[in-house]
């Protein structure tokens, strides 16, 4: 009867791969060298059959839906951008000026480009009128500061309320009712714009004269830094009086500058009529 050899029989050192007999580490040529590779960790592809990862179908569906939405938004944005460019091009072809906000440079809120939109012979006069508008902005801003100092010292809330109204209404209204019409008149030579400017600018000059005087019968107490309010305040509080005298000087300078602008614009309008 044939007996199968026992693979675990230590008697046959040549067949036992774990035997160190005889030759130690460097065995003879008759011995077969067995190489070992490190065992692979059990994981994907190990064991009975290959393991699979189940991806929820609803997740895949949501991803596809989001991709479609993003694609739709992108298409819509491109369409709107093309439509805006087409309208701008149509306006340019029709001769309508495109007014992009560019002033002040750090926070553009208005369009202002004297160098490119006003004729060269009128640019100096327009810059002078622009200085007049900046002057009333400075006057009303300083008036607000001076009245705030007086309000803190005396505690009259009406002063604070009126000074706030002067600043919040006076600055934007001065731009809208007389500076912007003059800018338009210089650019288009519109007689109507010139007429509107003259009317509103006379009101502006009248306000500056009254503010420089600050009579208590017109404005409440010390809500304007005119000469009368400055003298009254200086006799009580020197520091506050200095604030008021500075405001008085600013209103005087603004009045003189505005009168000069009015004369020059009127001379140009009469000569160009």
From Swiss-Prot:
Record region (Disordered): 1-69
Entry's transmembrane regions: 132-152, 159-179, 194-214, 239-259
GO cellular component: plasma membrane; recycling endosome membrane; trans-Golgi network membrane; transport vesicle membrane
Biased composition (Gly residues): 20-30
Family from the record: Belongs to the SCAMP family.
Entry function: Probably involved in membrane trafficking.
Protein name: Secretory carrier-associated membrane protein 6
């Amino acid at each position: 009867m044939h007996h199968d050899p026992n693979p675990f029989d230590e008697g046959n050192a040549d067949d036992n791969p774990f035997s160190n007999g005889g030759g130690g580490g460097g065995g003879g040529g008759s011995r077969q060298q067995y190489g070992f590779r490190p065992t692979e960790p059990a994981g994907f592809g190990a064991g009975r059959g290959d393991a699979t990862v189940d991806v929820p179908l609803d997740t895949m569906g949501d991803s596809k839906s989001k991709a479609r939405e993003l694609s739709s938004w992108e298409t819509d944005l491109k369409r709107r951008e093309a439509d805006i460019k087409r309208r701008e091009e149509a306006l340019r072809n029709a001769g309508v000026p495109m007014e992009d906000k560019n002033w002040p440079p750090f926070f553009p809120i208005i369009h202002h480009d004297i160098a490119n939109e006003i004729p060269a012979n009128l640019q100096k006069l327009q810059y002078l009128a622009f200085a007049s508008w900046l002057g009333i902005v400075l006057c009303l801003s300083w008036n607000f500061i001076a009245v705030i100092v007086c309000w803190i010292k005396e505690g009259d809330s009406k002063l604070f309320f009126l000074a706030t109204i002067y600043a919040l209404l006076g600055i934007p209204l001065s731009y809208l009712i007389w500076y912007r019409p003059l800018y338009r008149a210089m650019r288009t030579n519109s007689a109507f714009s010139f007429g509107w400017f003259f009317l509103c600018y006379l009101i502006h000059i009248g306000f500056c004269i009254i503010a420089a005087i600050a009579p208590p019968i017109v404005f409440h107490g010390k809500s304007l830094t005119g000469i009368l309010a400055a003298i009254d305040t200086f006799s009580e509080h020197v520091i506050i009086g200095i604030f008021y005298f500075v405001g008085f000087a600013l209103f005087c300078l603004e009045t003189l500058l505005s009168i000069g602008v009015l004369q020059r614009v009127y001379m140009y309008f009469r000569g160009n009529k």
